[in-house]
Regions:
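Short, low-complexity, intrinsically disordered N-terminal peptides in bacterial proteins
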Residues: 1-2, 177
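N-terminal low-complexity or simple alpha-helical regulatory segments
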Residues: 2-84
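Long, amphipathic alpha-helical coupling/dimerization segments that relay conformational signals between
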Residues: 6, 65-172, 176
């Protein structure tokens, strides 16, 4: 693939790219929830994505992308990151790549232009799927949270009307259990 030269350029400079991305995310009012997360965690997540970009674009299947971004979304829910902030951060991740490539890649021929367009298509496809599955992950995490809340309310109601006994304390003595 012609665009692999550009992908390798991104992977080679993954540390610098991740620092730039982290600064953009932390300074964006549209992604301000990410200020709740340790900066080192954000930097490592971005570096991992950029460093393994070729694998994500060429070797990973759609199921792999779904699994990864649903898990990321579930983790972000636990961290208090709202969905629209996560989506903005993903868009910043993609945009950071393109700014870098425009700055660093010197297109000397129509072949290199074709390679960049080919890479752009792959990246857009990847990030579209990442956003889709991240949203799905948020929805699944919210549904699980809602079910746990509903179950807790149902148990409390059953106890209050005498259908269930109140839960026992976890620290029972030997006399109480015999």
């Amino acid at each position: 693939m012609l665009g692999m030269k550009l992908v390798r350029l991104i992977e080679k400079h993954s540390e610098a790219l991740s620092r730039e991305l982290m600064e953009q995310v932390l300074n964006s009012e549209h992604a301000s929830d990410f200020q709740k997360i340790p900066q080192e965690d954000l930097r490592l997540a971005a570096t991992d994505l950029y460093r393994n970009l070729e694998e994500w674009l060429l070797q990973k299947r759609e199921d792999d992308i779904a699994e990864r971004f649903k898990a990321v979304a579930a983790r972000r829910v636990q961290e208090g990151i709202r969905p629209h902030h996560m989506m903005w951060a993903l868009m910043l991740t993609r945009d950071c790549l393109w700014r870098y490539l425009r700055k660093e890649a010197f297109l000397d021929s129509i072949v290199e232009l074709h390679a960049e367009l080919e890479l752009q298509q792959l990246l857009n496809q990847f990030f579209d799927r990442a956003i889709y599955y991240a949203i799905q992950g948020y929805e699944e995490a919210e549904e699980q949270r809602r079910r746990r809340t509903d179950w807790t309310r149902a148990q409390e109601l059953a106890v209050s009307i005498g259908l269930l006994s109140p839960p026992r304390a976890h620290h029972e003595t030997a006399e109480e259990t015999s």
